[in-house]
Every structure is written in C-alpha cells, then in structure tokens.
C-alpha cells in the first residue's frame, strides 16, 4: 500500500524560510515541495485549466512517484447540470493526461446547491467518464448526509 501526503497548493510565499529554504524563489516552489511531500490536490485547476506547457513543466519538476490530484474546474462542476459539461470535462482530462503515472485521482467538488435530486445527472456524468481515470466526488449539500443517501 502506498500512502501519499500533500496539500492543496505548493505556491505559498509564507512557507519560505520554514517549509521552503530561506531565499527560495517562486519558480522553485514545486521542486522544494516534492522534496517533502508526495501528492498535491491541485486546487489551481479549479479556477483555470492549465496550458499544456504548464502541465509539461509539472512533469519535468516532479519524480514519477509524485501524484497530482487535479480538481475539476468550477466552470464544469458549478454551472448547473454536469451532463451539460461532459465534453468540457473530457477536454480537461485530456489536458491532464500528459501527467502519465503522476496523475492521481481527480476531484469533482460539487457545489452546496447540488442536491440528491440530481443523482441521475451525477450518475450519467460519471458513466461518460473514461474508465482509466479515478474520480473522487465531494458532495456538499446537506441532504446527501441524510437517509437514504447516507
């Protein structure tokens, strides 16, 4: 069994001098991060899809054993029914594929308004996702934690 430990970000200037060595430049944050941690939630992808060149630099600056766990962009997860955004989700997955073995589970964080009444939409969306992609779903509407959904 492999255990991975990480944070949702690596680019935090407040870590310079304690978590990162004193004088570490932002361009070197990822290289320093992977010296201590083995995974990253990848919260930046929630706000914007990275350019392919950015993904390439992530590969170049991390060992093959490192795992990126990108968050599905909010433009997909927070804009209504997921099924309407299947193509955009597949495009996002393809942007992440160059991570190769570094690609860990992806996170689909649902907004608090996404209730169990949309379970059919969620199931249809997940059914259309590639089977080789691991996808974790975070529900936030309180009704998900009530019977019969708990």
Residue ranges, per PLM feature:
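Residues lining hydrophobic/aromatic ligand-binding pockets adjacent to catalytic sites
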Residues: 1-150
């Amino acid at each position: 069994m492999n255990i991975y430990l990480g944070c949702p970000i690596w680019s935090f200037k407040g870590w310079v001098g304690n978590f990162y060595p004193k004088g570490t430049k932002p361009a070197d944050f990822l290289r320093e991060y992977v010296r201590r941690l083995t995974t990253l939630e990848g919260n930046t992808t929630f706000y914007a899809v990275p350019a392919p060149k950015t993904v390439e630099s992530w590969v170049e600056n991390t060992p093959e054993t490192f795992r990126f766990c990108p968050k599905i962009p909010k433009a997909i997860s927070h804009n209504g029914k997921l099924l309407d955004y299947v193509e955009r989700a597949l495009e996002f997955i393809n942007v992440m594929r160059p991570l190769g073995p570094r690609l860990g589970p992806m996170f689909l964080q649902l907004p608090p308004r996404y209730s169990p009444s949309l379970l059919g939409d969620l199931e249809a969306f997940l059914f259309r996702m590639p089977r080789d992609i691991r996808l974790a779903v975070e529900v936030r509407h309180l009704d998900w934690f009530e019977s019969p959904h708990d």
